[in-house]
Regions:
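Ligand-binding clefts/hinges and TM-proximal coupling segments of bilobed small-molecule sensing domains
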Residues: 54-71, 111, 141-181, 291, ...
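Immediate post-signal peptide segment of exported/extracytoplasmic ligand-binding proteins
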Residues: 31-46, 167-207, 242, 285
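Extracytoplasmic small-molecule ligand-binding "clamshell" domains
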Residues: 39, 70-74, 82, 151, ...
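Periplasmic-binding protein-like
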Residues: 96, 100-140, 161-172, 195, ...
Length: 517
C-alpha cells in the first residue's frame, strides 16, 4: 500500500512538472491570420469579444451581414487576448481602457487608431427598484458636479492608481433601517461586478479594485450606505440583479434596447470608446519571453496570488466533503425505496417520486441545476454560496449514487433478507445490518467513480460567484494574462485530489474485503 501511494505521489510530481514545462514553452501560431489596419478590414475577419459585452453586440451586427465575418465569444477578456496572441482570431474588440491594460502586459499587441464605436457605462438595477434608481442617479449627478468621478477616472488612467477613492467608515453613515427599507436594501448596497476588466474592476492583493469600485463606494457615501462588491461572471450580473441577489450591477455595462427590456439602468457615469486590437507579431516589441521560473513567480508569488488558489482549494474541499455526505445519505434512501418496490411491491407513490427525481436530475446539466437552485429556489433568501453549491452538487450526485447502490442491493441474494427476518430483525434492521454492508462492498468502486465525478464537477461553482479552484485560476489569468501556468497547476491539484480520493476508496475496499477471508 505504501509503495502504491509513493507511485501516486511520483505520478503527481511528474504531471505537475510536465504542465509547468508546457506552460513555459507556450504555443506557436498555428496559421497566418488576416492583417487588419482599419475598421474596413473587419470584413471576413474572425473577431474575438467577451461574451455579453457591448463589443459582443456590435461585432454580432457585423456577423449578421453575411460577408464572412465571424465572432468568437469568450467568457473573459483574458481568454480572448490569449486567443489573439496565438493567432486563433484576427482581432479583438473591447473598450479602450482595458485594451491599454492588455497592451501593457503584451507589448506585441497593437490598438488601431480608428474608433470602432462609442458608448457609455451605466449601473443596472431591478425595474421595480425605482427609489433606488433615483437615489443612485442623484448621487451620480452630485459626484459629476463635484468632479469626483472625473478625478477617479483620471487617477486610474493617467497615474495608474488602483484605489483612487477612500470610502467613509460605517459609523459616519447615518442612514437608518427605515431609509434602507425604503431603498429596498437590507444592510448594504450590494454591487455585482466581473473583476476581469482592468482598469474598471480587477483584483490586486486579494481585493477587488478599479474605477467602478471607486465609483460604487463614492455613490454609497453620497447615499449614506455601506457598499459591498461581489465578483461573478459577467453574464450572471443582470440575472443576479433581477433575482435580488444584489441590488445593482456595475461592470462596464452599456445600455442597449435589448437589456432595457429586462432591467433598469441609471444615468451614465463614464463615456468610453470601442477599439480594435490586433497582434502585430513583433518579436522585438514583445522582448525576451519570461522563462518558467519567471512565469511561476508572476502567477503565484507576486502580490501573494497563490492565495486565490488556496482559497479555492479550501472551498472545493468543503463543497466536495459535504456534497458527498448528502449524496450518499439521500442516494441510499432512494435506493432502498426503489429496491423495496421492485422486490416486494408497494411504496408506489414514493417510488414514483424517486423515479421523477432521478429523471430530472440525470436529464438536466449540473450547471443548469446549480443556477436554478441559486437564482430561483433561493432567489429571495440570502444564503451562503457554499451551502447552495453543497445542495446543488449533493442533489445531482445523489441521483447517480442511488442507482449504483440500488444495483448493489439487488445483487444481494433475497434469501439474506428472509434470513434476517426469520431471526426476528425488522425490515429496517435487516437492511441496515445485513443487506447494505454487502451492497456497499459490491459497488464501492462504482461509487468511487461517481464521487470523483462530483469532485471535478465543483469546478463550475464560479458561475454563482464562488471562488473554487478553477475560479482561482481565472482570477490569476485575468491579472497576468498567462493561460497555461495557472491552468496547469490547477489541473495538477485536481489530479492530486482525485488520486487521494481514489486511494481512500481502495483502502476502504481492501478493509471491507477482509471479511471474505
Amino acid at each position: 500500500m505504501k509503495y502504491r501511494n509513493l507511485r501516486c505521489l511520483r505520478l503527481s510530481f511528474w504531471a505537475m512538472l510536465l504542465c509547468l514545462f508546457l506552460a513555459a514553452c507556450g504555443s506557436e501560431s498555428s496559421e497566418t491570420r488576416k492583417q487588419l489596419k482599419t475598421k474596413a478590414d473587419l470584413k471576413g475577419a474572425v473577431i474575438g469579444v467577451q461574451l455579453g459585452t457591448t463589443s459582443d453586440g456590435l461585432a454580432t451586427e457585423l456577423e449578421k451581414k453575411g460577408d464572412g465575418t465571424k465572432v468568437e465569444r469568450y467568457n473573459k477578456g483574458a481568454d480572448a487576448i490569449q486567443a489573439l496572441l496565438q493567432d486563433k482570431i484576427d482581432c479583438m474588440v473591447t473598450d479602450e481602457a482595458p485594451a491599454k491594460a492588455f497592451k501593457r502586459v503584451n507589448p506585441s499587441l497593437n490598438i488601431l487608431p480608428e474608433t470602432f464605436d462609442a458608448s457609455s457605462f451605466a449601473i443596472c438595477v431591478a425595474k421595480d427598484h425605482a427609489e433606488l434608481k433615483q437615489s443612485i442617479n442623484n448621487a451620480i449627478r452630485i459626484l459629476k458636479a463635484n468632479g469626483v468621478i472625473d478625478s477617479i477616472v483620471n487617477r486610474h488612467l493617467e497615474r495608474g492608481i488602483a484605489v483612487a477613492y477612500t470610502p467613509k467608515t460605517s459609523d459616519v453613515k447615518k442612514v437608518g433601517p427605515e431609509a434602507l427599507k425604503h431603498l429596498g436594501l437590507k444592510k448594504s448596497l450590494r454591487f455585482a461586478t466581473n473583476a476581469t476588466f482592468e482598469p474598471f474592476e480587477y483584483y490586486q492583493n486579494g481585493k477587488i479594485v478599479g474605477i467602478d469600485v471607486d465609483v460604487a463606494n463614492a455613490i454609497g457615501d453620497v447615499m449614506g450606505v455601506d457598499v459591498e462588491i461581489l465578483d461573478m461572471e459577467f453574464d450572471a450580473i443582470i440575472t443576479s440583479v433581477q433575482a435580488g441577489k444584489v441590488e445593482a450591477g456595475i461592470a462596464g455595462i452599456t445600455v442597449t434596447p435589448e437589456r432595457e427590456k429586462n432591467i433598469g439602468f441609471t444615468d451614465s457615469y463614464a463615456d468610453v470608446r470601442q477599439v480594435i486590437m490586433v497582434n502585430s507579431g513583433d518579436v522585438k516589441a514583445a522582448g525576451n519571453q519570461p522563462g518558467m521560473i519567471d512565469k511561476f513567480k508572476s502567477c503565484f508569488m507576486d502580490d501573494n496570488r497563490y492565495q486565490y488558489l488556496l482559497q479555492g482549494l479550501g472551498n472545493t474541499l468543503i463543497i466536495t466533503l459535504f456534497a458527498i455526505i448528502l449524496s450518499v445519505i439521500l442516494g441510499t434512501v432512494i435506493a432502498i425505496v426503489r429496491a423495496r418496490h421492485e422486490r416486494r411491491g408497494g411504496w408506489r407513490i414514493p417510488n414514483m417520486l424517486c423515479q421523477l427525481y432521478l429523471t430530472i436530475m440525470r436529464g438536466t446539466p449540473t450547471m443548469v441545476q446549480l443556477l436554478i437552485i441559486y437564482y430561483v429556489v433561493f432567489a429571495s433568501a440570502d444564503v451562503n454560496k457554499i451551502f447552495v453549491a453543497v445542495i446543488a452538487f449533493g442533489l445531482n450526485s445523489a441521483a447517480y449514487i442511488a442507482e449504483v447502490i440500488r444495483s448493489g442491493i439487488m445483487s444481494v441474494d433475497e434469501g439474506q433478507m428472509e434470513a434476517g427476518r426469520s431471526l426476528g430483525l425488522s425490515y429496517g434492521k435487516t437492511m441496515r445490518l445485513i443487506i447494505l454492508p454487502q451492497a456497499f462492498k459490491n459497488v464501492l468502486p462504482a461509487m468511487g467513480n461517481e464521487l470523483i465525478t462530483l469532485l471535478k464537477e465543483t469546478s463550475i461553482s464560479g458561475y454563482i460567484g464562488l471562488v473554487d479552484l478553477t475560479k482561482g485560476s481565472d482570477i490569476i489569468r485575468s491579472i497576468t494574462y498567462e493561460a497555461m501556468m495557472p491552468l496547469g497547476v490547477v489541473a495538477c491539484l485536481y489530479l492530486i485530489l482525485v488520486l487521494g480520493l481514489n486511494a481512500g476508496v481502495r483502502k476502504l475496499e481492501k478493509r471491507l474485503r477482509k471479511s471474505e477471508r
